[in-house]
């Protein structure tokens, strides 16, 4: 694996690069484990390295979507606006559990606490709904990028927030119209959004949002959408 100098990067974020992500093939079958660092180097991504990930979309009882702006300390896509929470299950027994995507949902609960300070008891795995999966690839800069099969998870709940400033620069709840305005700002270069959020907003998000009481029609655990 290539050697990359991380001395100039945020120390807390560099520590997280040692976490072990789940390596998968293009059909989301586990084939091994690799560090977060190696999973996110473009040099490895270009050779086909692919890992499992998730994206959470949390709506409050007013049907507003919780967005976050990634902190400037983040190694990939710093300062970008994105959906509620995006991260990776780790290669450990609890988060490798594949039955009903329980491992991924446990990972989402863990990261909602770590990033946004949401108490674990407010987002139990059984209240995190697994819809479908998308497969995408994107570069952050010349060194770092993403290549993931992303589990799409929806939560509908009012939650307590206490964000970690090392993870999150800002957050806000938005209506559909407010998100459309934010997407226009991103298109004009006024703000930055993450590539996966851009993809999901352009394809599925508003359909889900229009049908929050009838999400079963969008549940598809067989297909992986190639974006």
From Swiss-Prot:
Annotated gene: IDI1
Name the record gives this protein: Isopentenyl-diphosphate Delta-isomerase 1
Sites of N6-acetyllysine modification: 176
Motif Microbody targeting signal: chain residues: 225-227
Major location category of this protein: other
GO molecular function: isopentenyl-diphosphate delta-isomerase activity; magnesium ion binding; manganese ion binding; metal ion binding
Tagged with keyword NADP: no
Organism: Homo sapiens
Pathway stated in the Swiss-Prot or TrEMBL entry: Isoprenoid biosynthesis; dimethylallyl diphosphate biosynthesis; dimethylallyl diphosphate from isopentenyl diphosphate: step 1/1
Keyword vocabulary terms for this entry: Acetylation, Cholesterol biosynthesis, Cholesterol metabolism, Isomerase, Isoprene biosynthesis, Lipid biosynthesis, Lipid metabolism, Magnesium, Metal-binding, Peroxisome, Steroid biosynthesis, Steroid metabolism, Sterol biosynthesis, Sterol metabolism
Cofactors named for this entry: Mg(2+)
């Amino acid at each position: 694996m290539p050697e990359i100098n991380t001395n100039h990067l945020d120390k807390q974020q560099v520590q997280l690069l040692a976490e072990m992500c789940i390596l998968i093939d293009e059909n989301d079958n586990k084939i091994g484990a690799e560090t977060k660092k190696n999973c996110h180097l473009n040099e490895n991504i270009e050779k086909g390295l692919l890992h499992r990930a998730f994206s959470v979309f949390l709506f409050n009882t007013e049907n507003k979507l919780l967005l976050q702006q990634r902190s400037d300390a983040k190694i990939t896509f710093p300062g970008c606006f994105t959906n509620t929470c995006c991260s990776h299950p780790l290669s450990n027994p609890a988060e490798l559990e594949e039955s009903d995507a329980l491992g991924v949902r446990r990972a989402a609960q863990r990261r909602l606490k770590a990033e946004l300070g949401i108490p674990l008891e407010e987002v139990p795995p059984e209240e995190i709904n697994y819809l479908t999966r998308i497969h995408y690839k994107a570069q952050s800069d010349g060194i770092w990028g993403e290549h993931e099969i992303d589990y799409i998870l929806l939560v509908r709940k009012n939650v307590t927030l206490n964000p970690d400033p090392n993870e999150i620069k800002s957050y806000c709840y938005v209506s559909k119209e407010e998100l459309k305005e934010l997407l226009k700002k991103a298109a004009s270069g006024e703000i930055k959004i993450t590539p996966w959020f851009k993809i999901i907003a352009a394809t599925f998000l508003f359909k889900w949002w229009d049908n929050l009481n009838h999400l079963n029609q969008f549940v598809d655990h067989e297909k992986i959408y190639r974006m």
